[in-house]
Swiss-Prot record:
The keyword Cell membrane applies. It is a peripheral membrane protein. InterPro entries: Membr_insert_effic_factor_YidD. GO terms for cellular component: plasma membrane. It comes from Agrobacterium fabrum (strain C58 / ATCC 33970) (Agrobacterium tumefaciens (strain C58)). This is Putative membrane protein insertion efficiency factor. HAMAP family: UPF0161_YidD. Keywords: Cell inner membrane, Cell membrane, Membrane. It holds the Pfam family YidD. It is found in: Cell inner membrane. Its main location: membrane. NCBIfam families: membrane protein insertion efficiency factor YidD.
Length: 119
């Protein structure tokens, strides 16, 4: 792009555009693979019929993919479900990233605590 010798702008741009989902590494457990596979199946099939109508950045399916990949099927699945619930009319909009780590109050037996309020 810039024409400088040794420039890697073009290589980075091609690599970043490969997938719209989170590209970070995650533990390939059966639950996580099932969850991200299910979301990817939705993205490749039904998402085209529904259209681009998500009010958030990243979209709800991208959020769900990243949440499950980072935090596992249980926690990430609840986070994705609550995100879809917030996406409808009267809900929130704007930038709503997946948290890097979950705080100590979010345990597996208290799924209602995964509901994060957009600030």
């Amino acid at each position: 792009m810039c024409g400088e010798p040794g420039c890697r702008h073009e290589q980075t741009a091609v690599k970043a555009g490969r997938s719209r989902n989170w590209a970070g590494s995650f533990a390939k457990t059966p639950g996580r693979l099932f969850g991200v596979g299910f979301i990817r199946l939705y993205q490749l099939t039904l998402s085209g019929f529904v259209g681009n109508s998500c009010r958030h950045i990243p979209t709800c399916s991208e959020y769900g993919y990243e949440a499950i990949a980072r935090h596992g099927l249980w926690a990430g699945g609840w986070m994705a479900l609550f995100r879809v619930a917030r996406c409808g009319p009267g809900g929130t909009s704007g930038l709503d990233p997946v948290p890097e780590e979950l705080d100590g109050s979010k345990r597996w037996w208290t799924p209602w605590r995964y509901w994060s309020r957009h600030r």
